[in-house]
């Protein structure tokens, strides 16, 4: 929604019903064309937006993103429980900001505490798709708008695991045979 506002630092001050209407409108009135996959980035937690998306959109699955911090894990655990209660399939778990590789020694430093990715994946009954390190190069490329230039082994492995976790696209039989 931020892209629809006059200024990028304008706040979206909407309550639940207006947010739900906007989500429904995006889903029903945007001409998405033929999609193999539509990714929807949601705010953390179980508030109006994630709840509306999980209840209103025909989801084939969700990917849970967490970080090692205790507070983040508590919030994410609630989202996992919400997905289970709403019978939404959890396709996988990703742990962001999992560690930093020291440029001097090459040693992994767990800036935000020990990894909890495996525990979260176990609780979610889903595979751990990967762990994303804190990487100053990635931050710089994001800020400069050049993220497509980023290349790292952890990110490549995560991308492959993420693609494998996605459901196979539904295509007519003639498309699958190459005709």
List the predicted regions and their residue ranges.
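Glycine-rich phosphate-binding loops of nucleotide-dependent enzymes
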Residues: 23, 42, 55, 91, ...
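Inter-motif core of Ras-like GTPase G domains
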Residues: 22-37, 49-71
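Charged, alpha-helix-enriched surfaces in structured cytosolic catalytic cores
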Residues: 14-21, 37, 44, 48, ...
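Hydrophobic residues in beta-strands of the RecA-like P-loop NTPase core, especially within AAA+ ATPase
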Residues: 39-40, 94
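Conserved nucleotide-binding/hydrolysis micro-motifs of P-loop NTPases
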Residues: 4-6, 44-46, 68-72, 97-101, ...
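C-terminal lobe/tail of nucleotide-utilizing enzymes
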Residues: 80-179
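P-loop/Walker-type NTP enzyme "switch/lid" segment
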Residues: 1-36, 101-104, 136-149
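Helical hairpin unit composed of two closely spaced alpha helices linked by a short loop
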Residues: 57-95
């Amino acid at each position: 929604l931020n892209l629809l506002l006059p200024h990028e630092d304008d706040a979206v001050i909407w309550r639940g019903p207006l947010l739900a209407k906007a989500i429904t409108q995006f889903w029903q009135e945007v001409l998405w064309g033929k999609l193999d996959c539509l990714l929807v980035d949601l705010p953390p937690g179980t508030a109006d937006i994630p709840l509306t998306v999980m209840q209103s959109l025909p989801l084939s699955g969700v990917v849970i993103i967490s970080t090692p911090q205790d507070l983040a894990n508590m919030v994410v655990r609630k989202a996992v429980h919400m997905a289970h209660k709403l019978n939404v399939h959890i396709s996988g778990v990703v742990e962001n900001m999992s560690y930093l590789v020291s440029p001097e020694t090459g040693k992994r430093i767990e800036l935000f505490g020990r990894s909890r990715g495996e525990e979260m994946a176990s609780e979610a009954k889903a595979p751990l798709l990967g762990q994303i390190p804190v990487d100053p190069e990635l931050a710089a490329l994001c800020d400069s708008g050049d993220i497509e230039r980023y290349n790292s082994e952890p990110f490549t492995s995560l991308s492959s695991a993420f693609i494998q976790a996605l459901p196979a696209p539904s295509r007519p039989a003639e498309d699958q045979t190459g005709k």
